[in-house]
Structure formats: structure tokens, C-alpha cells
A protein has these predicted regions:
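Substrate-binding pocket helix/loop in short-chain dehydrogenase/reductase
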Residues: 97-98, 105-110
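Conserved glycine-rich cofactor-binding loop
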Residues: 16-18
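Active-site loop of short-chain dehydrogenase/reductase
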Residues: 7-8, 82-83, 128-133
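Conserved glycine-rich Rossmann-like NAD(P)H-binding loop of the short-chain dehydrogenase/reductase
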Residues: 30-47
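The beta1-alpha1 cofactor-binding region of Rossmann-like NAD(H)/NADP(H)-dependent oxidoreductases
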Residues: 42, 63-75, 103
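A short, exposed helix-loop element centered on a Lys and neighboring polar residues
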Residues: 121-122
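Conserved NAD(P)H cofactor-binding loop of Rossmann-fold oxidoreductase domains
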Residues: 90-94
Length: 133
């Protein structure tokens, strides 16, 4: 059981299911405290967080935050004073024919899968560098 206040802290986006959930579990097993985010499935994410806390004895915070929205990501980072690991896992896909996809849908996919990595990383790096200064 890892209840140390100075345990490493990891943030995982898109952590309510699939790869993000598996990454969160691996980090919890390794003793990391976690901040987990997702855009639409907060009840699922809260269940994941509760299970990880119970199973691994870590602190796990679930937050609704659309990684493609800079303001939502800024709210997540506003309460952090350090961060050791960032996992940019949030992602979506478009199911259908390319010829049926609108420009808006394409922009949403790009914003979620690519721009979100920029939004989170630009806020995470300064916190990560604090540990090394």
C-alpha cells in the first residue's frame, strides 16, 4: 500500500476505458498517485479511480476534462504543484467514409488526437522540470 505523500504523480488523459485504463492500472500498481481525465464518461472514470484506490492503496482523482479544450486542461493543472508522468492517451476516431466526413469532424479528431497533446504537455513540462531544478 502506497500512501506516501511524496509518491510520484501521474496524469492520464482518456483513462475511463481501454488503453488509458490499462495504463492507469499499471501506474497504480507501480505506486503512482493518479489524476485521471476523460471527456464524457465521468461515472465510468470515477469507478476506475475507486477500484484503483482500493486495489493499490494509492490516491486517484477522477476529473471530467475534454483534452481538446485548453480551458478544461488548464483547470486540471491549476491545482497541481508537481507532476512526474504525463500520458497523453485521449483519442477519438471517425467511423465512416472519408467522403462523408465534414471539415468540422476532421478538426475535432485532430484537436482531440493531436492538439490535446500540445495543450497538456505545455502545462506539464514546467511542473516536471521543477523536480530537476
Amino acid at each position: 500500500m502506497n500512501t506516501r505523500k511524496n509518491a510520484p504523480l501521474a496524469l492520464v488523459t482518456g483513462a475511463s476505458r481501454g488503453i488509458g485504463k490499462a495504463i492507469a492500472e499499471a501506474l497504480a500498481e507501480a505506486g503512482y498517485h493518479l489524476i485521471l481525465t476523460c471527456s464524457h464518461t465521468l461515472p465510468d472514470l470515477q469507478e476506475v479511480a475507486a477500484c484503483l484506490e482500493e486495489k493499490y492503496g494509492i490516491t486517484c482523482t477522477a476529473m471530467a476534462a475534454d483534452a481538446s479544450e485548453p480551458a478544461a486542461i488548464e483547470k486540471v493543472f491549476a491545482s497541481l504543484d508537481h507532476l512526474d508522468v504525463l500520458v497523453n492517451n485521449a483519442g477519438i476516431s471517425y467511423i465512416g467514409l472519408l467522403t462523408d466526413m465534414s471539415v468540422e469532424e476532421w478538426q475535432h479528431v485532430l484537436n482531440t488526437n493531436l492538439s490535446s497533446c500540445f495543450y497538456t504537455s505545455r502545462l506539464a513540462v514546467p511542473l516536471m522540470l521543477l523536480k530537476h531544478s
